[in-house]
Amino acid sequence: MSASAADAQTIAHPKSFLMASSAAHMTPQERTSSFSLASIFALRMFGLFIILPVFAVYARELPGGDSETLVGITLGIYGLTQGLLQIPFGVASDRLGRKPVIIFGLIIFALGSFLAASGANIWIVMLGRMLQGAGAISAAVTAFIADSVRVQVLTKAMAMVGASIGLTFALSLLISPPLTKLWGVSGLFTLTGISALIAVLVVKFVVPPAPQSAIDEKNEHRSWRKVVCDPQLVRLNIGIFVLHAVLTAIFVVIPTRLVYMRLPSEHHWWVYLPAVIAGFALMAPPLIFGEKKQAVVRVMRFMIGFLTVAFVLFAYLIHSIWEIAFLLGIFFIGFNVLEATLPNLVSRIAPAADRGLALGVYNTTQNIGLFVGGALGGAISQHFGPEAVFFVCASAMLIWFASSFGLQEPARPNREPGEVIK
Protein backbone atom coordinates (compact mmCIF):
# COMPACT_ATOMS: atom_id res chain seq x y z
CA MET A 1 0.00 0.00 0.00
CA SER A 2 1.77 2.70 -1.71
CA ALA A 3 2.28 4.38 -1.65
CA SER A 4 3.72 5.29 -1.92
CA ALA A 5 5.93 5.03 -0.78
CA ALA A 6 7.29 3.36 2.84
CA ASP A 7 10.06 1.90 4.96
CA ALA A 8 11.07 -0.28 7.85
CA GLN A 9 9.26 -1.49 10.90
CA THR A 10 9.97 -3.47 14.09
CA ILE A 11 10.31 -6.78 15.89
CA ALA A 12 7.51 -6.21 18.38
CA HIS A 13 7.10 -2.48 17.99
CA PRO A 14 8.45 0.00 15.40
CA LYS A 15 10.84 1.58 17.89
CA SER A 16 12.77 -1.65 18.49
CA PHE A 17 13.95 -1.75 14.89
CA LEU A 18 14.83 1.91 14.96
CA MET A 19 17.04 1.33 18.00
CA ALA A 20 18.70 -1.73 16.48
CA SER A 21 19.32 -0.45 12.97
CA SER A 22 22.22 1.86 13.79
CA ALA A 23 24.28 3.14 16.68
CA ALA A 24 23.91 6.71 15.48
CA HIS A 25 21.39 8.95 17.25
CA MET A 26 19.09 11.48 15.64
CA THR A 27 19.31 15.12 16.57
CA PRO A 28 16.09 16.80 17.80
CA GLN A 29 15.62 18.50 14.42
CA GLU A 30 16.13 15.21 12.59
CA ARG A 31 13.51 13.58 14.80
CA THR A 32 11.06 16.42 14.21
CA SER A 33 11.63 16.32 10.45
CA SER A 34 11.30 12.54 10.28
CA PHE A 35 8.16 12.31 12.41
CA SER A 36 6.41 15.22 10.71
CA LEU A 37 7.22 14.04 7.19
CA ALA A 38 6.19 10.51 8.15
CA SER A 39 2.87 11.97 9.26
CA ILE A 40 2.46 13.55 5.80
CA PHE A 41 2.84 10.14 4.23
CA ALA A 42 0.47 8.62 6.80
CA LEU A 43 -2.27 11.21 6.31
CA ARG A 44 -2.11 10.93 2.53
CA MET A 45 -1.88 7.14 2.48
CA PHE A 46 -4.78 6.88 4.93
CA GLY A 47 -7.00 8.34 2.24
CA LEU A 48 -5.82 5.74 -0.26
CA PHE A 49 -5.77 2.70 2.01
CA ILE A 50 -9.25 3.29 3.42
CA ILE A 51 -10.71 2.87 -0.07
CA LEU A 52 -8.76 -0.24 -1.05
CA PRO A 53 -10.55 -3.00 0.94
CA VAL A 54 -14.11 -1.93 0.08
CA PHE A 55 -14.15 -0.22 -3.30
CA ALA A 56 -14.35 -3.36 -5.44
CA VAL A 57 -17.52 -4.38 -3.57
CA TYR A 58 -19.25 -1.03 -3.14
CA ALA A 59 -18.46 0.19 -6.67
CA ARG A 60 -21.08 -2.28 -7.88
CA GLU A 61 -23.74 0.04 -6.49
CA LEU A 62 -22.62 2.80 -8.89
CA PRO A 63 -23.87 3.03 -12.48
CA GLY A 64 -21.14 1.33 -14.55
CA GLY A 65 -19.70 -0.39 -11.48
CA ASP A 66 -20.84 -3.85 -12.57
CA SER A 67 -17.79 -4.17 -14.84
CA GLU A 68 -14.76 -5.64 -13.03
CA THR A 69 -12.55 -4.10 -15.70
CA LEU A 70 -13.88 -0.58 -15.02
CA VAL A 71 -13.59 -1.09 -11.27
CA GLY A 72 -9.98 -2.21 -11.69
CA ILE A 73 -9.18 0.77 -13.91
CA THR A 74 -10.79 3.14 -11.39
CA LEU A 75 -8.69 1.67 -8.59
CA GLY A 76 -5.53 1.80 -10.68
CA ILE A 77 -5.90 5.06 -12.62
CA TYR A 78 -4.64 6.93 -9.59
CA GLY A 79 -1.33 5.20 -10.26
CA LEU A 80 -1.32 6.23 -13.92
CA THR A 81 -1.49 9.97 -13.22
CA GLN A 82 0.92 9.53 -10.32
CA GLY A 83 3.29 7.83 -12.71
CA LEU A 84 3.04 10.58 -15.30
CA LEU A 85 3.70 13.38 -12.79
CA GLN A 86 6.16 11.97 -10.25
CA ILE A 87 9.20 12.99 -12.30
CA PRO A 88 7.99 16.59 -12.93
CA PHE A 89 7.13 16.96 -9.23
CA GLY A 90 10.47 15.46 -8.18
CA VAL A 91 12.48 17.70 -10.50
CA ALA A 92 10.43 20.74 -9.44
CA SER A 93 11.20 19.97 -5.80
CA ASP A 94 14.93 19.83 -6.63
CA ARG A 95 14.76 23.32 -8.09
CA LEU A 96 11.84 25.14 -6.42
CA GLY A 97 12.06 23.62 -2.96
CA ARG A 98 10.37 20.65 -1.33
CA LYS A 99 7.70 22.42 0.74
CA PRO A 100 5.93 24.43 -2.02
CA VAL A 101 5.75 21.39 -4.29
CA ILE A 102 4.41 19.14 -1.52
CA ILE A 103 1.71 21.66 -0.53
CA PHE A 104 0.64 22.12 -4.16
CA GLY A 105 0.38 18.36 -4.65
CA LEU A 106 -1.65 17.85 -1.47
CA ILE A 107 -4.17 20.50 -2.56
CA ILE A 108 -4.62 18.76 -5.94
CA PHE A 109 -5.06 15.44 -4.13
CA ALA A 110 -7.75 16.97 -1.89
CA LEU A 111 -9.64 18.39 -4.88
CA GLY A 112 -9.63 14.98 -6.54
CA SER A 113 -10.95 13.39 -3.36
CA PHE A 114 -13.87 15.80 -3.16
CA LEU A 115 -14.65 15.25 -6.85
CA ALA A 116 -14.70 11.47 -6.33
CA ALA A 117 -16.98 11.96 -3.31
CA SER A 118 -19.49 13.75 -5.53
CA GLY A 119 -19.42 11.04 -8.19
CA ALA A 120 -22.83 9.76 -9.25
CA ASN A 121 -21.34 7.06 -11.48
CA ILE A 122 -18.12 5.11 -11.96
CA TRP A 123 -16.84 7.59 -14.55
CA ILE A 124 -16.94 10.60 -12.18
CA VAL A 125 -15.24 8.54 -9.48
CA MET A 126 -12.61 7.53 -12.04
CA LEU A 127 -12.02 11.19 -12.89
CA GLY A 128 -11.66 12.03 -9.20
CA ARG A 129 -9.15 9.20 -8.73
CA MET A 130 -7.23 10.51 -11.75
CA LEU A 131 -7.04 13.98 -10.15
CA GLN A 132 -6.01 12.45 -6.82
CA GLY A 133 -3.08 10.87 -8.59
CA ALA A 134 -2.04 14.21 -10.05
CA GLY A 135 -0.92 15.26 -6.56
CA ALA A 136 2.28 13.29 -7.05
CA ILE A 137 4.28 14.21 -3.93
CA SER A 138 5.88 10.90 -2.92
CA ALA A 139 9.25 11.66 -4.52
CA ALA A 140 9.38 15.15 -3.03
CA VAL A 141 8.54 13.92 0.48
CA THR A 142 11.04 11.06 0.35
CA ALA A 143 13.73 13.41 -0.98
CA PHE A 144 12.88 15.92 1.79
CA ILE A 145 13.47 13.19 4.38
CA ALA A 146 16.81 12.30 2.81
CA ASP A 147 17.73 16.02 2.77
CA SER A 148 16.79 16.49 6.41
CA VAL A 149 18.84 13.74 8.07
CA ARG A 150 22.42 12.54 7.95
CA VAL A 151 23.07 9.43 5.91
CA GLN A 152 24.04 7.58 9.13
CA VAL A 153 20.43 7.79 10.34
CA LEU A 154 18.65 7.62 6.97
CA THR A 155 17.51 4.05 7.64
CA LYS A 156 15.95 5.18 10.92
CA ALA A 157 14.14 8.04 9.20
CA MET A 158 12.82 5.75 6.49
CA ALA A 159 11.81 3.30 9.23
CA MET A 160 9.59 5.96 10.78
CA VAL A 161 7.89 6.45 7.43
CA GLY A 162 7.39 2.72 7.01
CA ALA A 163 6.03 2.30 10.52
CA SER A 164 3.60 5.18 10.08
CA ILE A 165 2.36 3.86 6.74
CA GLY A 166 2.02 0.33 8.06
CA LEU A 167 0.08 1.42 11.13
CA THR A 168 -2.10 3.61 8.92
CA PHE A 169 -2.78 0.63 6.67
CA ALA A 170 -3.79 -1.50 9.66
CA LEU A 171 -6.08 1.27 10.97
CA SER A 172 -7.63 1.69 7.52
CA LEU A 173 -8.42 -2.01 7.27
CA LEU A 174 -10.06 -1.88 10.69
CA ILE A 175 -12.29 1.17 10.20
CA SER A 176 -12.93 1.12 6.44
CA PRO A 177 -15.81 -1.41 6.35
CA PRO A 178 -17.84 0.11 9.23
CA LEU A 179 -17.29 3.66 7.96
CA THR A 180 -18.35 2.60 4.48
CA LYS A 181 -21.53 1.10 5.90
CA LEU A 182 -22.15 4.34 7.82
CA TRP A 183 -21.18 6.96 5.22
CA GLY A 184 -20.78 5.10 1.94
CA VAL A 185 -17.83 5.33 -0.43
CA SER A 186 -18.49 9.05 -0.97
CA GLY A 187 -17.98 9.63 2.75
CA LEU A 188 -14.62 7.86 2.58
CA PHE A 189 -13.51 10.09 -0.28
CA THR A 190 -14.57 13.17 1.70
CA LEU A 191 -12.52 11.93 4.66
CA THR A 192 -9.61 11.47 2.26
CA GLY A 193 -9.82 15.10 1.14
CA ILE A 194 -9.94 16.33 4.73
CA SER A 195 -6.87 14.27 5.66
CA ALA A 196 -4.97 15.84 2.75
CA LEU A 197 -5.85 19.36 3.95
CA ILE A 198 -4.64 18.47 7.45
CA ALA A 199 -1.39 17.33 5.85
CA VAL A 200 -1.04 20.76 4.22
CA LEU A 201 -1.14 22.36 7.67
CA VAL A 202 1.51 19.95 8.94
CA VAL A 203 3.84 20.83 6.05
CA LYS A 204 3.26 24.55 6.52
CA PHE A 205 3.58 24.82 10.29
CA VAL A 206 5.31 21.70 11.67
CA VAL A 207 7.93 20.42 9.19
CA PRO A 208 11.30 22.19 9.71
CA PRO A 209 13.19 23.52 6.67
CA ALA A 210 15.96 21.35 5.26
CA PRO A 211 19.50 22.06 6.52
CA GLN A 212 21.54 24.53 4.46
CA SER A 213 24.04 21.78 3.59
CA ALA A 214 21.29 19.85 1.79
CA ILE A 215 20.29 22.98 -0.11
CA ASP A 216 23.91 23.62 -1.14
CA GLU A 217 24.28 20.06 -2.46
CA LYS A 218 21.59 20.75 -5.06
CA ASN A 219 23.89 23.00 -7.03
CA GLU A 220 25.67 20.02 -8.63
CA HIS A 221 23.15 18.28 -10.91
CA ARG A 222 24.05 15.30 -13.08
CA SER A 223 22.63 14.70 -16.54
CA TRP A 224 19.09 13.38 -16.15
CA ARG A 225 19.94 10.53 -18.52
CA LYS A 226 22.67 9.32 -16.18
CA VAL A 227 20.20 9.26 -13.31
CA VAL A 228 17.28 7.73 -15.21
CA CYS A 229 19.42 5.08 -16.94
CA ASP A 230 21.61 4.14 -13.97
CA PRO A 231 21.61 0.30 -14.03
CA GLN A 232 21.32 0.02 -10.25
CA LEU A 233 18.34 2.35 -10.09
CA VAL A 234 16.67 0.68 -13.09
CA ARG A 235 16.68 -2.66 -11.25
CA LEU A 236 15.05 -1.06 -8.23
CA ASN A 237 12.47 0.66 -10.43
CA ILE A 238 11.50 -2.65 -12.01
CA GLY A 239 11.04 -4.02 -8.51
CA ILE A 240 8.71 -1.32 -7.25
CA PHE A 241 6.65 -1.54 -10.46
CA VAL A 242 6.05 -5.25 -9.96
CA LEU A 243 5.47 -4.98 -6.21
CA HIS A 244 2.67 -2.45 -6.53
CA ALA A 245 1.15 -4.07 -9.59
CA VAL A 246 0.65 -7.32 -7.70
CA LEU A 247 -0.64 -5.44 -4.62
CA THR A 248 -3.43 -3.76 -6.60
CA ALA A 249 -4.20 -6.90 -8.59
CA ILE A 250 -4.88 -9.05 -5.54
CA PHE A 251 -7.12 -6.40 -3.96
CA VAL A 252 -9.26 -6.44 -7.08
CA VAL A 253 -9.79 -10.17 -6.50
CA ILE A 254 -9.78 -10.83 -2.75
CA PRO A 255 -12.64 -8.56 -1.55
CA THR A 256 -15.10 -10.05 -4.05
CA ARG A 257 -13.84 -13.54 -3.22
CA LEU A 258 -14.55 -12.98 0.48
CA VAL A 259 -18.07 -11.80 -0.35
CA TYR A 260 -18.52 -14.93 -2.46
CA MET A 261 -17.59 -16.93 0.65
CA ARG A 262 -20.45 -15.18 2.50
CA LEU A 263 -18.24 -12.89 4.58
CA PRO A 264 -19.96 -9.46 4.59
CA SER A 265 -17.70 -6.62 3.50
CA GLU A 266 -18.05 -4.86 6.87
CA HIS A 267 -16.33 -7.91 8.41
CA HIS A 268 -13.45 -8.17 5.95
CA TRP A 269 -11.18 -6.54 8.50
CA TRP A 270 -11.35 -9.84 10.40
CA VAL A 271 -9.18 -11.23 7.60
CA TYR A 272 -7.09 -8.16 6.75
CA LEU A 273 -6.07 -6.93 10.19
CA PRO A 274 -4.48 -10.16 11.51
CA ALA A 275 -2.63 -10.50 8.21
CA VAL A 276 -1.21 -6.98 8.46
CA ILE A 277 -0.24 -7.47 12.12
CA ALA A 278 1.53 -10.71 11.23
CA GLY A 279 3.37 -8.89 8.46
CA PHE A 280 4.48 -6.25 10.95
CA ALA A 281 5.58 -8.69 13.60
CA LEU A 282 7.72 -10.82 11.30
CA MET A 283 9.22 -8.28 8.91
CA ALA A 284 11.85 -6.78 11.21
CA PRO A 285 14.23 -9.77 11.59
CA PRO A 286 15.13 -9.90 7.88
CA LEU A 287 15.52 -6.11 7.79
CA ILE A 288 17.85 -6.12 10.79
CA PHE A 289 19.80 -9.07 9.37
CA GLY A 290 20.24 -7.27 6.06
CA GLU A 291 21.55 -4.09 7.71
CA LYS A 292 23.87 -5.82 10.19
CA LYS A 293 25.33 -8.33 7.73
CA GLN A 294 25.37 -5.91 4.80
CA ALA A 295 23.11 -8.34 2.96
CA VAL A 296 20.24 -6.03 1.99
CA VAL A 297 20.19 -7.17 -1.63
CA ARG A 298 20.32 -10.84 -0.65
CA VAL A 299 17.39 -10.37 1.73
CA MET A 300 15.50 -8.54 -1.01
CA ARG A 301 16.10 -11.34 -3.48
CA PHE A 302 15.00 -13.98 -0.96
CA MET A 303 11.76 -12.09 -0.33
CA ILE A 304 11.06 -11.87 -4.06
CA GLY A 305 11.26 -15.66 -4.23
CA PHE A 306 9.19 -15.90 -1.04
CA LEU A 307 6.36 -13.89 -2.62
CA THR A 308 6.56 -15.87 -5.85
CA VAL A 309 5.82 -19.06 -3.91
CA ALA A 310 3.03 -17.26 -2.00
CA PHE A 311 1.26 -16.34 -5.25
CA VAL A 312 1.42 -19.90 -6.53
CA LEU A 313 -0.14 -21.05 -3.24
CA PHE A 314 -2.81 -18.35 -3.60
CA ALA A 315 -3.84 -19.86 -6.94
CA TYR A 316 -4.43 -23.26 -5.33
CA LEU A 317 -5.52 -22.32 -1.79
CA ILE A 318 -8.12 -19.60 -2.22
CA HIS A 319 -11.14 -21.76 -1.39
CA SER A 320 -11.67 -20.82 2.27
CA ILE A 321 -11.48 -17.70 4.41
CA TRP A 322 -8.77 -19.24 6.60
CA GLU A 323 -6.58 -20.02 3.60
CA ILE A 324 -6.92 -16.45 2.34
CA ALA A 325 -6.12 -15.02 5.79
CA PHE A 326 -3.01 -17.21 6.14
CA LEU A 327 -1.69 -16.39 2.68
CA LEU A 328 -2.35 -12.67 3.15
CA GLY A 329 -0.19 -12.82 6.28
CA ILE A 330 2.57 -14.45 4.22
CA PHE A 331 2.12 -11.82 1.52
CA PHE A 332 2.41 -8.88 3.93
CA ILE A 333 5.63 -10.20 5.45
CA GLY A 334 7.31 -10.17 2.05
CA PHE A 335 5.58 -7.00 0.88
CA ASN A 336 6.57 -5.03 4.00
CA VAL A 337 10.21 -6.09 3.80
CA LEU A 338 10.45 -5.15 0.12
CA GLU A 339 8.49 -1.92 0.59
CA ALA A 340 10.93 -0.98 3.36
CA THR A 341 14.04 -1.90 1.42
CA LEU A 342 13.50 -0.36 -2.01
CA PRO A 343 13.17 3.40 -1.28
CA ASN A 344 16.03 3.20 1.20
CA LEU A 345 18.27 1.72 -1.51
CA VAL A 346 17.23 4.39 -4.02
CA SER A 347 17.96 7.20 -1.54
CA ARG A 348 21.41 5.79 -0.76
CA ILE A 349 22.42 5.08 -4.37
CA ALA A 350 21.06 8.26 -6.00
CA PRO A 351 23.30 11.38 -6.10
CA ALA A 352 22.17 13.90 -3.49
CA ALA A 353 21.64 16.76 -5.96
CA ASP A 354 19.30 14.65 -8.11
CA ARG A 355 17.60 12.65 -5.39
CA GLY A 356 14.23 14.20 -6.28
CA LEU A 357 14.63 13.13 -9.91
CA ALA A 358 15.71 9.60 -8.96
CA LEU A 359 12.85 9.20 -6.52
CA GLY A 360 10.51 10.71 -9.10
CA VAL A 361 11.42 7.98 -11.56
CA TYR A 362 11.08 5.40 -8.78
CA ASN A 363 7.62 6.64 -7.81
CA THR A 364 6.61 6.88 -11.46
CA THR A 365 7.25 3.19 -11.97
CA GLN A 366 5.58 2.44 -8.63
CA ASN A 367 2.39 4.19 -9.60
CA ILE A 368 2.30 2.91 -13.15
CA GLY A 369 2.49 -0.48 -11.46
CA LEU A 370 -0.59 0.42 -9.42
CA PHE A 371 -2.48 1.26 -12.61
CA VAL A 372 -1.34 -1.79 -14.55
CA GLY A 373 -2.09 -4.09 -11.62
CA GLY A 374 -5.59 -2.73 -11.17
CA ALA A 375 -6.47 -2.72 -14.85
CA LEU A 376 -4.98 -6.14 -15.66
CA GLY A 377 -6.18 -7.68 -12.40
CA GLY A 378 -9.77 -6.73 -13.16
CA ALA A 379 -9.61 -7.82 -16.80
CA ILE A 380 -7.87 -11.14 -16.08
CA SER A 381 -10.27 -11.96 -13.24
CA GLN A 382 -13.29 -11.13 -15.39
CA HIS A 383 -12.20 -13.25 -18.36
CA PHE A 384 -10.07 -16.04 -16.85
CA GLY A 385 -10.97 -16.22 -13.15
CA PRO A 386 -9.16 -15.21 -9.93
CA GLU A 387 -6.66 -18.07 -10.06
CA ALA A 388 -5.23 -16.66 -13.29
CA VAL A 389 -4.54 -13.35 -11.53
CA PHE A 390 -2.29 -15.09 -9.01
CA PHE A 391 -0.40 -17.02 -11.69
CA VAL A 392 0.26 -13.76 -13.56
CA CYS A 393 1.47 -12.20 -10.29
CA ALA A 394 3.84 -15.12 -9.73
CA SER A 395 5.20 -14.72 -13.28
CA ALA A 396 5.79 -10.99 -12.71
CA MET A 397 7.71 -11.79 -9.52
CA LEU A 398 9.92 -14.21 -11.45
CA ILE A 399 10.77 -11.45 -13.95
CA TRP A 400 11.74 -9.19 -11.04
CA PHE A 401 13.81 -11.97 -9.49
CA ALA A 402 15.79 -12.36 -12.72
CA SER A 403 16.33 -8.59 -13.06
CA SER A 404 17.65 -8.32 -9.48
CA PHE A 405 20.85 -10.15 -10.36
CA GLY A 406 23.57 -7.59 -10.95
CA LEU A 407 22.27 -5.26 -8.23
CA GLN A 408 25.21 -4.30 -6.03
CA GLU A 409 25.12 -4.22 -2.27
CA PRO A 410 24.79 -0.56 -1.15
CA ALA A 411 27.37 1.29 0.89
CA ARG A 412 27.05 1.18 4.65
CA PRO A 413 25.01 4.08 6.06
CA ASN A 414 28.11 5.93 7.28
CA ARG A 415 29.26 6.47 3.68
CA GLU A 416 28.04 9.05 1.26
CA PRO A 417 24.82 8.43 -0.70
CA GLY A 418 25.58 7.35 -4.22
CA GLU A 419 28.63 5.28 -3.21
CA VAL A 420 28.30 1.57 -3.91
CA ILE A 421 30.54 -1.34 -3.02
CA LYS A 422 32.34 -2.72 -6.01
Which residues does each PLM region occupy?
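Helix-to-loop junctions at the C-terminal end of transmembrane segments
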Residues: 85-96, 282-296, 381
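C-terminal membrane-cytosol helix-exit motif in multi-pass small-molecule transporters
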Residues: 194-213, 403-408
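Cytoplasmic helix-loop-helix junction between adjacent transmembrane helices
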Residues: 128-166
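C-terminal transmembrane helical hairpin of 12-TM major facilitator-type secondary transporters
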Residues: 297-342
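Juxtamembrane intracellular "pre-TM" segments in multi-pass secondary transporters
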Residues: 20-31, 208-239, 422
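Structural signature of the two symmetry-related core transmembrane helices
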Residues: 100-114, 193, 298-313
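Residue-level signature of mid-helix packing/kink "hotspots" within the transmembrane helices
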Residues: 79-87, 169-170, 276-284, 370-371
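Conserved MFS/SLC helix-loop-helix module at the cytosolic interface between two early adjacent transmembrane helices
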Residues: 84-120
